[in-house]
Amino acid sequence: GVACRCDSDGPTVRGNSLSGTLWLTGGCPSGWHNCRGSGPFIGYCCKK
């Protein structure tokens, strides 16, 4: 999967670890949660 930035990773991508996984359709898989709260974002940033 493609890494994405969770809200807990910090305000910017540069210098921060990306702990989420990008899911484009259907929301996050079972047992995962969306870790990205708001902002212009395509798909869902999911985390176990």
UniProtKB/Swiss-Prot annotation:
> Which GO molecular function annotations are given, in alphabetical order?
sodium channel regulator activity; toxin activity
- Compartments (UniProt record): Secreted; Nematocyst
State the name under which the record lists this protein.
Answer: Delta-actitoxin-Bcg1a
**Annotated keywords:** Disulfide bond, Ion channel impairing toxin, Nematocyst, Neurotoxin, Secreted, Toxin, Voltage-gated sodium channel impairing toxin
- Primary localization class, coarse: secreted
Q: Name one GO cellular component term.
A: extracellular region
The cross-references to InterPro entries, in alphabetical order and at most eight, read: Anenome_toxin, Myo_ane_neurotoxin_sf
Q: Which residues form the signal peptide?
A: none
Family indicated by similarity: Belongs to the sea anemone sodium channel inhibitory toxin family. Type I subfamily.
